[in-house]
Amino acid sequence: MNHLQQRQLFLENLLVGVNNTFHQMQKRSVSTCCQSLQKILDHLILLQTIHSPVFRLDRMQLRQMQTLACLWIH
């Protein structure tokens, strides 16, 4: 599996995880959901990028996506 395929798979898994989490938390308030979502995204991003320098740029991009997602949810 090359870097592009790994990156695509990671982003797909991340989106699936975020989507599932969001649906599970819809009963709670939006701000609680957003905070929980950020914690989960932080964990996933760190887990996926900690061992690979190739993913450092991805980590920055994902943090930006995370912030935008939060603003969009609000």
UniProtKB/Swiss-Prot annotation:
Pfam families: Rota_NS6. It is found in: Host cytoplasm; Host mitochondrion. GO terms for cellular component: host cell mitochondrion. It comes from the Viruses. Keywords: Host cytoplasm, Host mitochondrion. InterPro entries: Rotavirus_NSP6. Interacts with NSP2 and NSP5. Belongs to the rotavirus A NSP6 family. This is Non-structural protein 6. It comes from Rotavirus A (strain RVA/Human/Japan/AU-1/1982/G3P3[9]) (RV-A).
